[in-house]
UniProtKB/Swiss-Prot annotation:
The lineage of its organism: Eukaryota, Fungi, Dikarya, Ascomycota, Pezizomycotina. InterPro entries: PMP3 (IPR000612). The chain crosses the membrane at residues 34-54. The gene is pmp-1. PANTHER family: HYDROPHOBIC PROTEIN RCI2 LOW TEMPERATURE AND SALT RESPONSIVE PROTEIN LTI6 -RELATED, PLASMA MEMBRANE PROTEOLIPID 3. It is a single-pass membrane protein. This is Plasma membrane proteolipid 3. GO terms for cellular component: plasma membrane. Plays a role in the regulation of membrane potential. Could mediate a proton leak. It is found in: Cell membrane. Pfam families: Pmp3. Belongs to the UPF0057 (PMP3) family. It comes from Neurospora crassa (strain ATCC 24698 / 74-OR23-1A / CBS 708.71 / DSM 1257 / FGSC 987). Keywords: Cell membrane, Membrane, Transmembrane, Transmembrane helix.
Length: 57
Protein backbone atom coordinates (compact mmCIF):
# COMPACT_ATOMS: atom_id res chain seq x y z
CA UNK A 1 0.00 0.00 0.00
CA UNK A 2 1.56 3.26 -1.11
CA UNK A 3 0.90 6.48 0.73
CA UNK A 4 -0.15 9.46 -1.32
CA UNK A 5 0.26 13.11 -0.39
CA UNK A 6 -3.42 13.27 0.53
CA UNK A 7 -3.01 10.33 2.94
CA UNK A 8 -0.16 12.14 4.69
CA UNK A 9 -2.27 15.31 4.97
CA UNK A 10 -5.22 13.31 6.36
CA UNK A 11 -2.97 11.66 8.95
CA UNK A 12 -1.65 15.05 10.10
CA UNK A 13 -5.21 16.40 10.33
CA UNK A 14 -6.31 13.24 12.19
CA UNK A 15 -3.67 13.76 14.87
CA UNK A 16 -4.77 17.38 15.40
CA UNK A 17 -8.55 16.87 15.04
CA UNK A 18 -9.55 13.20 14.59
CA UNK A 19 -13.16 13.68 13.36
CA UNK A 20 -11.98 15.97 10.58
CA UNK A 21 -9.59 13.32 9.28
CA UNK A 22 -12.39 10.75 9.25
CA UNK A 23 -14.71 13.21 7.52
CA UNK A 24 -12.14 13.79 4.76
CA UNK A 25 -11.78 10.03 4.25
CA UNK A 26 -15.35 8.69 4.66
CA UNK A 27 -17.67 11.69 4.64
CA UNK A 28 -20.62 12.16 6.96
CA UNK A 29 -21.60 8.67 8.07
CA UNK A 30 -21.44 6.19 10.90
CA UNK A 31 -17.64 6.26 11.03
CA UNK A 32 -17.70 10.01 11.65
CA UNK A 33 -20.21 9.74 14.48
CA UNK A 34 -18.29 6.88 16.09
CA UNK A 35 -15.12 8.95 15.90
CA UNK A 36 -16.79 12.01 17.43
CA UNK A 37 -18.01 9.84 20.32
CA UNK A 38 -14.57 8.29 20.81
CA UNK A 39 -12.91 11.71 20.71
CA UNK A 40 -15.32 13.03 23.35
CA UNK A 41 -14.70 10.00 25.57
CA UNK A 42 -10.95 10.23 25.13
CA UNK A 43 -8.69 11.98 22.67
CA UNK A 44 -6.38 8.99 22.13
CA UNK A 45 -9.16 6.53 21.12
CA UNK A 46 -10.35 9.12 18.61
CA UNK A 47 -6.88 9.36 17.08
CA UNK A 48 -6.49 5.57 16.92
CA UNK A 49 -9.87 5.18 15.22
CA UNK A 50 -9.13 7.99 12.76
CA UNK A 51 -5.79 6.46 11.81
CA UNK A 52 -7.45 3.07 11.40
CA UNK A 53 -10.08 4.52 9.06
CA UNK A 54 -7.53 6.48 7.02
CA UNK A 55 -5.16 3.54 6.65
CA UNK A 56 -7.94 1.04 5.91
CA UNK A 57 -9.63 2.94 3.06
Amino acid sequence: MAFTASDICKIIVAVILPPLGVFFERGCGADLFINILLTILGYLPGIVHALYIILKY
